[in-house]
Amino acid sequence: MANSNTNQLHPLGATTSQTFITALNHTAASTIAINFRELIKEPKELDEASNYLYQALLDDVVAGIFIETHHLRKTGNLAALDGVGEENLESAFHICEMPNLDIFGISTAKKQMDCTCPNCDRLVAAARFAPHLEKCMGMGRISSRIASRRLATKEGSSASTSSTSTYLQSGGNTGGTDDEDDVDWSSDKRKKKSTQSSRNNGSKKNNGKTF
């Protein structure tokens, strides 16, 4: 074949080579179609022209398959094109039939979302996060009242503690003790009792006299 060397791939890119071959084959085929009558007259030239057309078509098909395979190899789709072998067919189409799982074995149960409270750092369910945060930060009406009461109680307890400590300190400075206070109280009580008994006796004597 005289023109078979012109159809060989040049050291260019795959797409450029295919475009070049397609253009060259189109030109050669057009030339053969124009000179078809003259080629019929010469059996030798007719044989060469038919061989040229066959080789051009074969090269075009082989180049197309090569470029497509190369593209699939680079993109990683060659394994998908090959498919799954018969030995791996059963494992490839295994269907999961367990409860709460889909056909691929993925859980279908809804997982409850938890949120962390920024105030107390506790894990709270997402559905109860808003009311918990409102109560925890004292932003609601009832919560604000409770928080105010707690604050007032805290202030009252601190005030009573401070007054008690002040009283104890003042008692210690004057030198008074609990025992002395008890003695004074008992003596006053005895005096009151003796005075009352003397009054009762005097009234009885006066009632017994005659005038």
From Swiss-Prot:
Keywords, in A-Z order: Activator, Chromatin regulator, Cytoplasm, Metal-binding, mRNA transport, Nucleus, Phosphoprotein, Protein transport, Transcription, Transcription regulation, Translocation, Transport, Zinc, Zinc-finger
Keyword Phosphoprotein: yes
Function as written in the Swiss-Prot or TrEMBL entry: Component of the transcription regulatory histone acetylation (HAT) complex SAGA, a multiprotein complex that activates transcription by remodeling chromatin and mediating histone acetylation and deubiquitination. Within the SAGA complex, participates in a subcomplex that specifically deubiquitinates histone H2B. The SAGA complex is recruited to specific gene promoters by activators, where it is required for transcription. Required for nuclear receptor-mediated transactivation. Binds independently on SAGA to promoters in an RNA-dependent manner.
Domain commentary: The long N-terminal helix forms part of the 'assembly lobe' of the SAGA deubiquitination module. The C-terminal SGF11-type zinc-finger domain together with the C-terminal catalytic domain of not/nonstop forms the 'catalytic lobe' of the SAGA deubiquitination module.
Gene Ontology terms: cellular component: cytoplasm; DUBm complex; nuclear pore; nucleoplasm; SAGA complex
Region entry Disordered, spans: 149-211
GO MF annotation, one: transcription coactivator activity
Lineage: superkingdom: Eukaryota
Protein name (Swiss-Prot/TrEMBL): SAGA-associated factor 11 homolog 2
Listed PANTHER family: ATAXIN-7-LIKE PROTEIN 3
Alphabetical GO biological process terms: chromatin organization; mRNA export from nucleus; positive regulation of DNA-templated transcription; protein transport; regulation of transcription by RNA polymerase II
Compartments in which it is found: Nucleus, Nucleoplasm; Cytoplasm
Biased composition (Low complexity): 157-166, 197-211
Zinc finger residue ranges, SGF11-type: 115-136
Quaternary assembly: Component of some SAGA transcription coactivator-HAT complexes, at least composed of Ada2b, not/nonstop, Pcaf/Gcn5, Sgf11 and Spt3. Within the SAGA complex, Sgf11, e(y)2, and not/nonstop form an additional subcomplex of SAGA called the DUB module (deubiquitination module). Interacts directly with not/nonstop. Interacts with the AMEX complex component xmas-2. Interacts with Cbp80; important for promoter recruitment of Sgf11 that is not associated with the DUB module.
Gene: Sgf11-2
InterPro entries, per the entry: SAGA_su_Sgf11 (IPR013246), SGF11 (IPR051078)
